[in-house]
């Protein structure tokens, strides 16, 4: 290998060997020197990115000492006295910075509260939205409102004076009658007609093929009292004896009507001639009247009631109810 340029020997770290850069005074923290005099005493920028809330100068002194010692070991060219002085100055600066940066917990709480005051309107809006989004709370409030409304209405009703019906309509006697009242009045009317013997709305007339009969002289409504089948009220033993006597005379007709009352058989004997029209009403299976018992003072009376509406001029008829062979042979008109 040929001879060339001589390689410069590395410096021994002395101050005289280092060329002057044109700056006077100590080294600047923001502009460190290039030739091995970098002290690296500045704040590492990585801490600001890792924890933004912490101040860069809030590092503990022990960490600073370790970093200083580490940098000192990397810079063997600097004398130890200068590095120690710079380390002490840096410690003082860091301690003063930590005192300023570290705030008491009370101040932090006050700052948080002040920040919260600025954020209160937004939080209130979010709270309102949350309340709107929750249907159960709205339902409960709605139910409370609904419950309050009837109470208010009841209070208003209680305050209003009570009005009587007589304040609007005059007092008058009611003309309406109950069913029992109507029935009792009808019974009294029939009792009076039976006891007095009045027979109104009919007359006796001659009917072809039958002889005497009764014709209606007025209209009768269904269920209305027509006439009483008047005669002698006798028991069955007396009725049988009289019937045997009447059978001996062919000119005497049979006007005897048998019925049961209180589990006992009775008979109305209307054979004797009287002026009562009930005994002259003729027989028919499809008559417009029917018989009915009427009690007056526990004494049964046999009356005729209209089975349907009867017009003026119609003959009054009812079914005798005798279906015996002897009766049918003696009186063939009973078949009709």
UniProtKB/Swiss-Prot annotation:
A molecular function GO annotation: histone H4K20 monomethyltransferase activity
EC number: 2.1.1.-, 2.1.1.361
Compositionally biased spans, kind Basic and acidic residues: 67-93
Similarity comment: family membership: Belongs to the class V-like SAM-binding methyltransferase superfamily. Histone-lysine methyltransferase family. PR/SET subfamily.
UniProt-annotated stretches for the region Disordered: 1-112
UniProt subcellular location: Nucleus; Chromosome
Domain of life: Eukaryota
GO biological process: cell division; methylation
A matching Pfam family: SET
Annotated residues for binding of S-adenosyl-L-methionine: 210-212, 255, 282-283
Protein name according to UniProt: N-lysine methyltransferase KMT5A
């Amino acid at each position: 290998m040929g001879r060339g340029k001589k390689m410069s020997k590395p410096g021994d770290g002395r101050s005289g060997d280092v060329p002057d850069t044109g700056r006077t005074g100590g080294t600047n923290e923001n502009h460190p020197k290039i030739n091995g005099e970098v002290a690296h005493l500045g704040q590492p920028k990585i801490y600001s990115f890792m924890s933004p809330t912490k101040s860069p100068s809030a590092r503990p002194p022990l960490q600073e000492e370790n970093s200083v010692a580490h940098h000192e070991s990397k810079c063997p060219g600097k004398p130890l006295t200068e590095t120690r002085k710079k380390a002490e100055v840096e410690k003082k600066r860091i301690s003063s910075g930590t005192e300023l940066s570290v705030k008491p917990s009370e101040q932090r709480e006050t700052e948080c509260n002040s920040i919260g005051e600025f954020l209160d309107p937004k939080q209130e809006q979010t709270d309102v939205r949350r309340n709107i989004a929750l249907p159960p709370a709205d339902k409960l409030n709605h139910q409370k409102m609904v419950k309050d409304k009837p109470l208010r209405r009841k209070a208003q009703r209680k305050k209003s004076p009570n009005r009587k019906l007589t304040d609007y309509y005059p007092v008058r006697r009611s003309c309406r009658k109950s069913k029992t009242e109507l029935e009792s009045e009808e019974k009294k009317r029939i009792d009076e007609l039976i006891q007095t013997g009045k027979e109104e709305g009919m007359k006796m007339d001659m009917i072809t093929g039958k002889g005497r009969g009764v014709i209606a002289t007025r209209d009768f409504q269904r269920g209305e009292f027509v006439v009483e089948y008047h005669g002698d009220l006798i028991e069955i033993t007396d009725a049988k004896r009289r019937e045997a006597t009447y059978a001996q005379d062919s000119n005497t007709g049979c006007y005897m009507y048998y019925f049961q009352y209180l589990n006992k058989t009775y008979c109305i004997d209307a054979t004797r001639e009287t002026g009562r029209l009930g005994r002259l009403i003729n027989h028919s299976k499809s008559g417009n009247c029917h018989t009915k018992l009427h009690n007056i003072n526990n004494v049964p009376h046999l009356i005729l009631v209209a089975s349907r509406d009867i017009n003026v001029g119609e003959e009054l008829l009812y079914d005798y109810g005798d279906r015996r062979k002897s009766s049918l042979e003696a009186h063939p008109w009973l078949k009709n």
